[in-house]
Structure formats: structure tokens, C-alpha cells
Amino acid sequence: MAGELSQEALLDFLCQAGGRVRNAELLSHFKSFLRDPHVSPGQLQERRERFKGFVNSVAAVRQDPDGTKYVVLKRRYRDLLGEEGLQRPGPVDGKPRGHRRRDPEPQKPPAGAGTQVDVGGSAQKVAGPDPSPEDSPNQRTPEPEAAQARGRCAAVGTRGRCCWECQQNGWGQSTGQPLPEDLGDPAVACEKPERAAPARDDLGAPGWLREGEAAEHAPGSVPPVWPPTAVEAAGSPTSPPALPPHPAPSREPLELFTAGSPNHSTQQLQQQHQRTQEWVARYLQVPEPEIQAPTRAWSVLPDNFLQLPSETAFGVSETSSALPEPALSFHSLLPVVLDESSESWPGNAPSTVFRSIRCQLSLQDLNDFVEQESHGSEESSSGPKESPGTPEEGLQPVLRTSSWGELRDPVEDLFLPPNDSPCLIRRDLGYRGNAPSFRKVPTVAKSLGDHPQEPFPALKFRRSVRRSSRTGRTKSPSSSDEEHPDEDLWKRSRRPPRSRKPSKAGALPSPRVDAVLVQKLADANAVASQPHSSWIPSRDGSAALIPHRPSEHRSPLVPLDTREHEWIVRLASGSWLHVLTLFWEDPQLALHRDFLTGYTALHWIAKHGDLCALQDLVSGAQKAGIALDVNVRSSCGYTPLHLAAIHGHQGVIKLLVQRLASRVNIRDCSGKKPWQYLNSNVSGETWQLLGAPRGKPIFPVYSLVQSSSPARKVKSREVSRNVTRKTSLAALLKTQHNKWKLASQYEKIHTSKEREEYSD
């Protein structure tokens, strides 16, 4: 029964049920809220409406051909299912769940023929007598055709295969997969170990790995038929070597763990958890990680799949190498690690499915960080940065490259020959630690040498489909191993992206993807200490130190020379003795312009109005052989003559115009000439010297004594009445046009009258 009626409880129930549950079971789960006899009918109706809204927001109702209605989770919430939700529910309290099977029922085999099993794309018939019902009491009897049609997927009859939903939930993988009640008897599970092996896409692990476990745990069981025969039927030249035999610590058969029902069997959880611990203790022997990495509950592969010791990598890589070449994929080549610390393992019994949402939110910043680093590593043409922790070696690169065939890591002196299988470096995605922890795993050199293999795909971190669909290009591996605690320092020290231009050291040869997979180390302190250089391997194999362009790291604040700074300060303050002293030390300072206002020494002297300083500067420039431009313009277009006119320094104006021949017709950025800045206190000689126009009063003249005669007042009223303000040019032209029209009409009338008088 449900503990509350909420959106979270409904979504949690659907996720635990595998994303698909019968309508009757869903109503029965929330029966205490929908049919509470102690609640009024109005409240019950309100609860029903609210429940319908909850269901419609996250799921849809679909009907099978037999009329059974199922509530199916929408695709946008499929990421919440994880590894638990993709598995089928097991029997609860001994009740079979045969009615929930949607894949086609197997046809009844003829006498003397075994069951046809479809594993790994090959069909085999195991010869043997048909067991009688007395010999195997738990064997399923043939059901009627109605029950078989009820268990089939609707898409099988139309398209010949199950729909995407059934394939994701693992209900249409193979026609010979037994129902959950077939797995209750240990004898049946021992006789058919290959049937108990789930699909690789559902459980996140290859099916043959689970079959190997079942063969080890089951006493006296028939060895699995699939690995040698199925691979030979698929066209593989060699058969995969089996895992090294180990004594089975438990004499119980392996049962298929499912998490699709709302309540799991406690005994089944304990047994599965115990077998997991024993298997990890025997095979992996991996210590608990110091920093718990966030887990993606919806991904097929666990986040710590890179954490592999040598023996596991050897066994899995050997078996993966014998798989048929067309079946090679990213999921088949990367092994799965069963770690006790992984939250996605069903034995831990997570409290709620919504931890996947929390993990998704916690990984949001990391995905953005990895995406930015991948984008920066793709666009930049430089090689690895210098290694942190070796400051005494100076500019020592992380990978000292003599050729593309052999790479050497100076951190732990790990040699990576080209013929070896890829070396996987575990990458802890924890946020709480400041120091990154790395585990380097040596691999066997000749594990893949005797079998031709496709190139190993480039590693990339899986993210949800909605996030990965935004970018059209493939992400390259990240250039850093974790988020640094000081993000601001990391962002400041990062090199800005450059345009994709050919490097000066030559075009870099594309390395073999299957040669080595090494995650580069990065540290914010090391990057900040050496931001202007990088090591780039050239064509001949030697590494070269290529400095970056200084323009990319130029600060927006341009530092001034000490003498230039003092020159500007002394000119602005009017300290002419210090100005002349600096001038004789460096005469070129007279041509220096202020970076803010664009003023030169002539501008500052004209602004202050010091005539003696101007004469000394001009004479000193003539002696030093420096040609002063008296018409130089500032940032606002002012010449020294403009500034002298603005401040009313008549002596400086006369010296600039008469002796230095400064031009008086230059306009500034406002379009004004120097004489337009003169005030009324300036003499007429200065006005004429600056070329002011003649014949017009420069300043308006008003009569001191105003006339009070009535005739003058009436005349002024008439003038003011006739002068009106027009709102637009069209109105003004319209009035003028009317005047012209009336005048022309008056002339026509007048001439006609004259003609009439003349005719009389």
C-alpha cells in the first residue's frame, strides 16, 4: 500500500515496477486513498481527480490485445529507471507473475528435441529426451492460445519484433526466456543456466558473465552451451577462453534478481548481496574508494567501470576479444565492475528511486565542466600541459614523447607499449576531495594479439540523450580529472579558444585511437604558473616548446613607463620645472600623447596658459631637432588653439597664431572653430586674430531704456501677432502657397477689369 498520495509516490511506484504496471495493480496500491470509507464523497472525488492528474503527467495508459490496461511510464522519465527498473519483477510471496509476460510464448517442441535457445544471435537445438511431467514437476505445461496471445507483444505480429519499450524492459529479448515462476526451483535453474542469463542491455553486464557465475554456483550443472558454439555460429574464428576456474563458495544456484515489483523478497536480496560480496572478495579485491563517486542510476555502465585490476581486465578483455567483429560496440568492449560501493547494484536495496534525480543534478556541473574541457582540448593545437608536482624540473611536459609508439608518464614512470591493450586510468568524480586520486592498471600485452580486433572506441562519458543531442560532434576526452576547488582561478588561468589554424610546428599526425587511453593531469597552480608555453610533438617525434602569442594573454590595462607616467602627472599639475627636466632627459616626450584625453604638452600648456613654459618648450624642441605639431588634435578634436580660446588665454593665442602659425579654421568634433569659444571679455584684436566674421554683432545689443510710447507698443503687438510658430515645414509651405495663390488671383481680376474698361 502507498504511504501517501503524491506525485513522488506515484513515480516511485512506477519506477520500481519497471515503468509498466497494470491498471488494477496501480489502483490497488493507492486503494487506501481512493476508496477510503472514512472520507466524504467530495474529498474522494477530489483525490481521484488529483490522482488522475498525477498519472497523466508522468505516464500513459495502453491496452494490450487481450484488453488488459497498463500504465506505462513516459519516455522522458525512462532515465529514472536505472539498472533496477530495467529488470523484470520476481515472484512475491510465492505468487507467479506469468500474466505480465509480453514476449511470445515458445512453441511446444516435438518429442526428442530440446528447447531452442536464442542467445547472442545463434540458435541451437540441444538434443535430449523430452522430460515427462513426473520427472520435472515444475516444468510448464502448454497454455491455451488465448493465454499465449495475451503474453505476446502487439508489435510482434506487425513488425516481426518487439517494440522499443519491451526491449528496454527486457520482456522481448528471446522467445525462449522462461517466466519468473520457472526460476523458483533450483533444479530448473541448474538445468537451464543459459535461460537465467539476462540481456546485456538490461542488466548492464554481458550475458555470458552471468552464466559463468551461474555455472560456478550451481553444483553438477550442465556447462553453458553458448560461449563456444554461439560464437562459432556467428562467424568468429576463435572461441572465447573461459574465466579461470575458482571454487564456488556457495552451493546455491544463481537466481535472477528483479526489481520490477513494488516489494522485493528480503531473502532474495540477502542472498544476492552475499553472493556479490563473495564474488568481489574473490575476484576484484578492490579496496573501498576514499571518495564516494556520484552514481548515475540510469546509465547502463557504472561510473567506476574504469576501476579494474589486472586480473579482471585480463579475463574480460580476452573474452571480449573473441566476440564477433560485427558485434563489437562500446558496451561490449568495456567491462562491468561489480563494486560493493556502487549504489546501482541491486543488493544494496536503495531507499528510493529518486536518488537518480539527485545524482543527475549533482553531475550537472561536472558534465558542463567536461564539455567545456573537451571543447577547449579540441580547438587548441597544443599538447599536454606540464605535470603538477614537479616544479624543480621547470618546463617538463606530462608526456615526454619520442614517438607516437611509446609514451612515458613522468608521474609514476609507467611505460605504455603500443601493442598493449589500452591502459585504463580510473577517474574519481568526487567533489569533496581536493587532491585527485588515480589508479593506473597495467594490462596484459598479448591479450588481444592473437585475434583481429576493431579499433578501440574513444572513451567518452555517457550523459542523457537530451543532453547529448544538443551537440552534433563527438566529445573528446576531458583534459582535467576533477573540478578544482578554486574555479575562478581555473577559469582565469585557462587559455582562450583559438581558431583552427595550422600550427607553426607542423600538422600533428592523427594518433591511433586504440594505442593508448591516458587521461591528462591538470592542476590550477601549474597552469597559472606557466600559461604562456606548451609542448607540441612534431612530425619527427620530438617534442617542441611552442610559446603562445602574447596578444592572447595581453592584459586590458597597459602599464605605463615610469618616466611617461611622471611626464603626464607633471603636465597635468603644471609643474613646469619638472616638465623641462624630463624633456631634456628625453626630448621625445614632447610628442607623447595622453592615453585618456589625447593631450600633448602643447595642449596642457595652452590649457594652463603659461606663456613662458610654451616659449621654453618651443625653443627646446628646436634645439633638440624635434618638429612640434601645433595643430595636433586631441580625442575630442581640440587643438591647442581651441583650449587657449576656451580658457581665454590671449597671450598664448597670439603666440600660437602669430609665431607658430597655428590654423584658425580647424573645427573640433563639435564642429566649432576656436573663435566660437571666445567670451565677451576678449579684446577685438583677438577676435580679428582668430578670424571672427565681420558685419554682424557677435553679442546681441539691447537698449538700456525701453520706449513706452503707445504707437510703438501697438506696432510690436502687430508684429508679434503676424509672427506665428509653425508646427512643421508642410504647414509653413501651405501658408506661403495660399499667399501666392491669392496674389495671382488678384492680378487676374485686376487685368480683366482693365480690359473691360478699355473695351468700353
UniProtKB/Swiss-Prot annotation:
Skewed-composition ranges (Basic and acidic residues): 191-203
Composition bias type Pro residues, residue spans: 238-250
Bias-annotated ranges (Low complexity): 379-394
Biased composition (Basic residues): 460-473, 492-503
Region (Disordered): 82-152, 171-268, 370-396, 445-512
Phosphoserine found at: 132, 239, 728
Keywords assigned by UniProt, alphabetized: ANK repeat, Phosphoprotein, Repeat
Name of the protein this chain belongs to: Ankyrin repeat domain-containing protein SOWAHB
Keyword Phosphoprotein: yes
Pfam family, one: Ank_2
ANK repeat positions: 597-626, 636-666
Homology family: Belongs to the SOWAH family.
Sequence intervals crossing the membrane: none
Family annotation (InterPro entries): Ankyrin_rpt (IPR002110), Ankyrin_rpt-contain_sf (IPR036770)
